[in-house]
């Protein structure tokens, strides 16, 4: 029996794209900071001149899938991370955006064969979003870690 697992130290050949929603950027910028901190601490060059990392900003979480698809299909990246924050309001808009973003991101991963990390917070309040983006913990770090694991796992599967 063969066991396949991603390793968090196999980062030398990893190229990652991060797509960040500008809407609720008070939250998403903190998620991005946590994500970049994780990637940097695990050996990914996160400098502005990095050849391992690119960041694309989109207007909101609804736009994440199309840009993630473009990046995943480019052949330049082993992993794409999507970061967004959708906070419930008084209208059904929340449900529409969350459903379409999650379905779209999952479809990109399935159709491209490139792991796409779903880093979209879905919360009832801004306070809950901020707690998940740095006040209590920063899920951006977790999304970075997921990307490293999936990139390494996909490389291991390709070599088997």
Curated annotation (Swiss-Prot):
One of its GO terms (cellular component) is riboflavin synthase complex. It comes from the Bacteria. The keyword Transferase applies. Its EC number is 2.5.1.78. It catalyses: (2S)-2-hydroxy-3-oxobutyl phosphate + 5-amino-6-(D-ribitylamino)uracil = 6,7-dimethyl-8-(1-D-ribityl)lumazine + phosphate + 2 H2O + H(+). Keywords: Riboflavin biosynthesis, Transferase. GO terms for molecular function: 6,7-dimethyl-8-ribityllumazine synthase activity. Pathway: Cofactor biosynthesis; riboflavin biosynthesis; riboflavin from 2-hydroxy-3-oxobutyl phosphate and 5-amino-6-(D-ribitylamino)uracil: step 1/2. InterPro entries: LS, LS/RS, LS/RS_sf. One of its GO terms (biological process) is riboflavin biosynthetic process. (2S)-2-hydroxy-3-oxobutyl phosphate binds at residues 90-91, 132. The keyword Zinc-finger does not apply. 5-amino-6-(D-ribitylamino)uracil binds at residues 23, 61-63, 85-87, 118. The active site is at residue 93. It holds the Pfam family DMRL_synthase. It is an enzyme of class 2 (transferase). Coiled coil: none annotated. Belongs to the DMRL synthase family. Catalyzes the formation of 6,7-dimethyl-8-ribityllumazine by condensation of 5-amino-6-(D-ribitylamino)uracil with 3,4-dihydroxy-2-butanone 4-phosphate. This is the penultimate step in the biosynthesis of riboflavin. PANTHER family: 6,7-DIMETHYL-8-RIBITYLLUMAZINE SYNTHASE, 6,7-DIMETHYL-8-RIBITYLLUMAZINE SYNTHASE DMRL SYNTHASE LUMAZINE SYNTHASE. NCBIfam families: lumazine-synth. This is 6,7-dimethyl-8-ribityllumazine synthase. The gene is ribH.
């Amino acid at each position: 029996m063969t066991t396949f697992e991603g390793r968090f130290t196999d980062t030398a050949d990893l190229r990652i794209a991060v797509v960040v929603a500008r809407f609720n950027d008070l939250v998403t910028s903190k998620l991005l900071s946590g994500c970049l901190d994780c990637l940097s601490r695990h050996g990914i060059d996160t400098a502005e001149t990095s050849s391992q990392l690119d960041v694309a900003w989109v207007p909101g979480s609804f736009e994440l899938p199309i840009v993630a698809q473009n990046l995943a299909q480019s052949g330049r990246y082993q992993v794409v991370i999507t970061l967004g924050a959708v906070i419930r309001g008084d209208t059904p808009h929340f449900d529409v955006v969350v459903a379409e973003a999650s379905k779209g991101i999952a479809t990109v991963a399935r159709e491209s064969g490139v792991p796409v990390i779903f880093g979209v917070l879905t919360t009832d309040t801004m306070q809950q979003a901020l707690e998940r983006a740095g006040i209590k913990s920063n899920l951006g770090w977790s999304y970075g870690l997921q990307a490293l694991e999936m990139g390494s796992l996909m490389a291991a599967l390709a070599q088997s």
